[in-house]
């Protein structure tokens, strides 16, 4: 396993979430790691787990499954499940967005006390494209999104499912007046909370032509699957809706400030 490879690192930015509902049904979703710095103390890193609010809403209990590390590398056949209850979403909602941010430093430290080291890679603020970079994107961009569609993942190696798609609406437009964009790709229930990337290897289009090299942008988070219902039959349209990462980061900065003030 080449952990210096960007694509390999992206495999470890997500975790599966499984929750129990009061009626006995089960919800599945995707969470991802995002780390921010304390602006007052740049040496302090605040690791967060982010997912959709609706993934955790009304859940009575559940678990998040982390990869375990040994000698700085993930152990393929080992993981640890961390339980949670309905309090997990308390005071953690990101404004009016369908997102929650959960501080995980305490969880990681508790596991360390039990000699359990988890392995993960955080998405960083510098992966978010600037407003100018978004304006310079093509209307049709290749997208990569990572998660657990229908709760599916490689439970032996503890890896998520990586899927590809394209922008069905330009990222620089607000889809239906909201800070969203539409994805044409295999977006199914369980994909909620999946981070969406523009990840190009070798070359990619720019406003000036074709650039040589690698490009990585964290552009959004999936929160809805588009379906059509007719004659009591549900048809997935292979479309998903994602929240723009710039808006997410704006809310995250407010959330972290509130977190530190408390």
Which residue stretches match the model-derived regions?
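N-terminal targeting leaders that route proteins to membranes or the secretory/organellar pathways
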Residues: 1-4
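C-terminal subregion of chymotrypsin/trypsin-like serine protease catalytic domains
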Residues: 7-10, 198-262
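Serine endopeptidase catalytic core focused on the charge-relay Asp
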Residues: 11-15, 19, 27-28, 32, ...
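Short loop segments and helix-boundary regions at transmembrane helix junctions
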Residues: 40-42
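Cytochrome P450 catalytic-core helices
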Residues: 51
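Hydrophobic pocket-lining residues within nucleotide cofactor-binding pockets
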Residues: 55-56, 226
């Amino acid at each position: 396993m080449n952990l210096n490879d960007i694509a390999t690192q992206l495999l470890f930015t997500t975790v599966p979430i499984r929750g129990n509902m009061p009626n006995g049904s089960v919800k599945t979703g995707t969470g991802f790691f995002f780390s921010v710095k304390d602006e007052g103390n740049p040496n302090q890193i605040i690791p967060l787990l982010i997912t959709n609010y609706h993934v955790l809403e009304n859940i009575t209990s559940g678990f998040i499954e982390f990869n375990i590390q040994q000698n700085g590398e993930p152990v393929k056949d080992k993981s640890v499940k961390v339980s949670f209850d309905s309090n997990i979403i308390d005071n953690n909602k990101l404004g009016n967005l369908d997102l929650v941010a959960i501080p995980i430093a305490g969880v990681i430290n508790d596991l360390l006390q039990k000699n359990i080291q988890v392995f993960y890679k955080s998405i960083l603020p510098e992966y978010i494209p600037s407003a100018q970079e978004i304006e310079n994107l093509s209307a049709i961009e290749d997208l990569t999104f990572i998660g657990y569609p229908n709760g599916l993942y490689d439970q032996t190696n503890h890896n998520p499912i990586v899927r590809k798609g394209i922008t069905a609406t330009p990222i620089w437009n607000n889809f239906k007046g909201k800070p969203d964009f539409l994805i044409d790709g295999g977006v199914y229930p369980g994909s909620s909370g999946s981070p969406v990337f523009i990840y190009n290897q070798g070359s990619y289009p720019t406003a000036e032509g074709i650039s040589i090299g690698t490009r990585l942008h964290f552009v959004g988070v999936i929160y809805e699957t588009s379906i059509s219902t007719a004659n009591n039959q549900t048809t997935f349209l292979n479309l998903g809706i994602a929240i723009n990462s710039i808006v997410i980061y704006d809310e995250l900065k407010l959330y972290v400030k509130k977190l530190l003030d408390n």
